[in-house]
A protein has these predicted regions:
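Acidic, histidine-bearing metal-coordination/catalytic regions of metal-dependent phosphoesterases
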Residues: 21-148, 168, 367-391
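Active-site neighborhood of phospho(di)ester-bond hydrolases with catalytic His/Asp-centered motifs
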Residues: 147-150, 173-179, 206-214, 296-300, ...
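Extended active-site neighborhood of metal-dependent phosphoesterases/phosphodiesterases
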Residues: 103-133, 188-285, 319-323, 342-375, ...
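Active-site-proximal segments of metal-dependent phosphoesterases and phosphodiesterases across multiple
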Residues: 263, 269, 287-331
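Alpha/beta-hydrolase fold active-site loops
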Residues: 143-144, 172, 237, 244-245, ...
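Bacterial Sec-dependent N-terminal signal peptides
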Residues: 1-25
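Conserved, compact domain cores that house catalytic/ligand-binding motifs in diverse enzymes
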Residues: 142-220
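Active-site environment of divalent metal-dependent phosphoester hydrolases
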Residues: 154-158, 182-185, 212-221, 255-259, ...
Length: 391
């Protein structure tokens, strides 16, 4: 009798364990972050606490199942992270090379002392589909192209139309220049607002780079922004190079003074912008920056000498512009104003500033010593067209 009871208990426990682990799945992703010439970060979200890892394979025509692929785990200081959200940074790539990859999440049922009990595994499909791929950046690539959108404010229904108008499938990379949602309230806001659509379109295989806007700084989830975007970078401001273009990604912070009642005393963006100036002062030493034909700044809020501008734009003018003038940048691409605007170089701002509206897309392609830019509206009509010659 005792044996039967014990057997029933074991069977029930087995069934319960199987039920508990049967539903693990990848909720969102994967999507690429901070793809550079020799590294890339891959991010995804599972629906249960789990460990995560990425497998990599060369894009050499062999079947993905042809051999065991090397694994790269989501870890912190040598310990595999148990989390819903996973981010894995892989290094030692070859520039301009395409790689195949696969993501995994294995549920962690319990972790007591030194004992860890694992459940089932969810993974991206390489059986019924081709493995996902990405291509690393290449500073020696002769030409490059990119598109930029901004100020979507959760209107995911216009993303596909804007990107299609710019022939995004033929471009090397995509840039999000801030205010993709109106408030960072929770994870669902991110994915329902713009990332699910982006993943479905391109973000699993085409690099996306994100400059934070002033609306991503708001909401109880705002401090989690970097867990999802640039999660393995030291800061949200950084530099990367693709072909003849060096991109300087800046974070312009909030638009009002830090003391404004809207921020409840939780912000210090004046100090944050000062930190970025100190970082920019070192860019002239960077080889990618020095050797690039074109130097393009991505920053959400544009600088302006208008007397009616708010504090954030004024601080960008005061702090960012002098060092950018010294660095000799070729173009600054901004958003924020919800209208199209173009400012030619002036005595104070020695580079052109293009502001993209919330209902248009910027499309850029290089051709030898020329960098050609178009701004297209929702109907695909060209509303601005510019060309820049390498200095």
């Amino acid at each position: 009798m005792k044996y039967i009871k014990k057997l029933i208990y074991v069977l029930l426990l087995t069934v319960a364990t199987q039920v508990a682990t049967a539903q693990i799945k990848i909720l969102y992703g994967p999507y690429l972050q901070n793809v550079k010439e020799n590294e890339a970060t891959i991010v995804w979200v599972a629906d249960k606490p789990s460990i995560g890892w990425v497998e990599l394979a060369p894009n050499d025509g062999t079947h993905y199942y042809g051999e065991e692929r090397p694994k790269y785990f989501d870890t912190t200081n040598g310990v595999k992270n148990t989390s819903l959200l996973h981010a894995v940074k892989v290094k030692a790539f070859t520039p301009g090379t395409t790689y195949r990859y696969r993501i995994y999440s294995q549920e962690v049922l319990s972790h007591e002392g030194i004992n860890v009990i694992y459940g089932r595994v969810a993974a991206s499909d390489v059986y019924k589909k081709n493995a996902l791929t990405f291509t690393t950046c290449d500073p020696n690539k002769k030409e490059t192209s990119f598109v930029m959108i901004n100020d979507i404010h959760g209107r995911e229904n216009i993303i596909t139309k804007l990107l299609n108008n710019a022939n995004y499938k033929d471009k090397d990379l995509i840039i999000f220049n801030g205010d993709m949602v109106s408030e960072f309230k929770d994870e669902q806001t991110i994915f329902n607002g713009f990332m699910k659509e982006s993943i479905d379109l391109f973000a699993s295989e085409k690099p996306m780079y994100y400059a934070r806007g002033n609306h991503e700084t708001r909401g109880e989830f705002a401090t989690s922004f970097q867990k999802y975007f640039s999660p393995k970078e030291p800061f949200l401001y950084y530099l990367f190079r693709q072909g003849p273009v060096c991109f300087i990604m800046l974070d312009t912070g909030e638009d009002k003074p830090d003391s404004d009642i809207e921020y409840s005393g939780i912000t210090d963006y004046d100090g944050y912008r000062t930190d970025q100036v100190e970082w920019m002062k070192e860019l002239y030493k960077n080889e990618d920056f020095k050797q690039a034909k074109f130097k393009v700044v991505i920053a959400h809020m544009p600088p302006s000498a208008d007397l009616n501008i708010w504090h954030g734009q004024k601080d960008v003018l005061k702090k960012f512009v002098p060092i950018l003038n010294e660095l000799g940048v070729d173009l600054m691409l901004c958003g924020h104003l919800h209208r199209n605007k173009y400012e030619e170089p002036s005595a104070g701002i020695k580079f052109p500033v293009l502001v993209n509206s919330n209902n248009s897309v910027v499309s850029v392609e290089t051709n030898g010593d020329q960098m050609n830019l178009e701004v297209l509206d929702l109907d695909g009509k060209v509303v601005t067209k510019k060309s820049y010659t390498a200095k």
